[in-house]
């Protein structure tokens, strides 16, 4: 990984998540407000393109920390920082292990892996927030929040192929060595 380029990418993604991401949200009566998780798109891209698991896990932890800090409560509200970081690490490790079973440049592969990533990450986060929250959470509230997380996962999965193509154009700025089998000619250069 090229960490300076990755740090700039994280900053840009967090900026886009808090500005453009708000424009991409939809409100449904049955589910609530859903919007895409742009950080998840970057995490899945890295899980598909980076060779080393350690680099992918550290990058996912940083992205999850950015999501935790970006979703902090308002003045006077308590926010638990850390569950999304750990959820991103768990989800990206699962996607990294599954990537060998798929063709990474296929649109359906990207969408399905983004869906799986978001279901794991946001499902873990919703469960942790429900368990660690100060207020008592009923099963119906927990179920409604899980439905909202599933809708967010579907929405992010739909946007993943577009995000993959955009990130592929600037991959050389933050990915040093791509995943896959190395060729002798490329390794000698």
Stretches found by the model and what they are:
Residues 1-189:
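Terminal, non-globular segments
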